[in-house]
Amino acid sequence: MVCGEDMEGNLTKGPILKTLTKLAIPIMASSFLGTLYNLTDMAWIGLLGSKAVAGVGVGGMYTWLSQGLASMARMGGQVQVAQCIGKGNRDEANKYAQTAVQLATLMGLVYAAIVLLFLHRLIGFFHLDDAEAIAAALSYTRIACGLIVFSFLTFTLTGIYTAQGDSKTPFIANLIGLVINMILDPVLILGPGPLPELGVAGAAIATVTAQGIVMSVMIIGIFVQKKDNVLKGIRLFARIPMEYVSGICKIGIPTALQGMAYCVISMVLARMVSVFGAEAVAVQRVGGQIESLSWNTADGFAAALNVFVGQNYGANKMDRVKKGYRASLWTVGIWGLIITAIFVFVPKPIARIFFHEATAIEIAVDYLIIVGLSEAFMCVELMTVGALSGLGKTHLCSVISIIFTGARIPLAILLCRTALGLNGIWCAVSSTSIVKGIIFVATFFWITRSSRILKDNSRL
C-alpha cells in the first residue's frame, strides 16, 4: 500500500540479487504500464487511420523531447538523493529533493510555453504533406505539450521515490493512471453514443488527465506514509538554492543533453522517413512503441540499478556495485533476447494489431525484423547507462551516446540511397544500437576496475 511503504530504503545491505530484484520489479512493472499507456493510445488511434497515427507520431516527438529535458531534474535529483542516503545524510537528501521538484515545475511550464508559441513551426519541421495528418499533429501537440508539467513532475517524483528504495508507490500511481487512461481513450477518441468524437484530441486529453492523476497519487503518498520520506516538508515556492541546483545540474545536464540529442536525432530520421509516406511515419511511431516492450523494461531496470549503485557508491561498497551490475546484465540481456525472438519470428501478427492497411503492415514487418536483431544490445546499453549514472559518470554516458546515436544520420543517408530504401534507415538504427551496447558494457568494466572511482567518491 502507498501508506505502508518502508521509506528507509537501505540498499547497501542484504542479499544483492534479492535486494535489486525487489526494487526492480515494481519499476519494471511501472515501465510496462508506461508501454501500455502508449500502446493503448496507438491501438485506438489506429482505428482512425494511418494519417491520424502519423500526426500523433509527430506530436509525440515533442512529448518525447520533453522527457529528455525532464531527465535533468529527475536524474540529478535521483542520483544525489540516493548518494546522500547511502552516506546517511537525509537532510541533504531532502534539500536535493525539493530543488529537483522546483526545477521540474519550472522547466515543465517553460517548455509548454515554448511549444505553444512555436507550434506551427515545430510541426512544419516534419514536412507532412497531408492536411489530415498536420491537423492531427497540431491538435495532439497543443494539448499534450500544453499540460506537460504533469509529466515533468511525475517523472521527477518517481525518481525521488525510487532513490529512497520505494518503487511500489510509483507503480500503484501508474496503475491507477493506466486504468483511467484505458477507460478514457475509447470514450474520448471514438465518442460512443451521444458523446462527441474527439479523435486525436481525445487521446491527448486522456493522456494528460491520467498523468495528472498519477502525479496527484504520488503527492498524496508523501503525506500519508508513516515512515520518513525526503519529499516531506518540501516547499515548492521557496527560493531555489543555487548550491543544490549546481549539484543536480552536474549530474542531470549530461543526461538531459543525451536524451534530447537522442530525440532530435530521431526527429531528423523521422523527417527522412516521411519521404516514404504517411504509412512509414506511422510505422516508425508505432514501431517505437512496440519496441518499448524491451527498452521501457530495460530502462525500468536501469532505474533500479541506478539507485542501487548510487547508494552503494555513496557507502563506498564497490564490490556490491560490481555484483549488482553482473546480475542485472544477465537478467536484462536474456529479456532482450526474448524480445528479439518475438520480433524476428512473429512480426506480422504484431503488426496487424496496430495496422489495417497492407502497405503499413508490410513496412512494420520489415521494421520489427531489422530492429529486433539489436534488442538485447539496446537493453544492455540502457541498463549500463543507469549503472554509470549512479556512479556520477553521466558526462561519459552522454559523450558515447551522442556520438554513436548521431552516427545514425549519415549512415541512414547512405543506406537509404541503396536498394534498401526505407529499410536502410532501420538498419542504421539497429547497427548503432549493437555497437553502443558493446561499448557501454566494456566502459563499465573498465571504469570499475580503476581505483580512481573511489578517489572521486571521497571528494563528493
Task: Mark where each language-model region is.
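Small-residue hotspots at the loop-to-helix junctions and early N-terminal turns
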Residues: 50-61, 137, 141, 204, ...
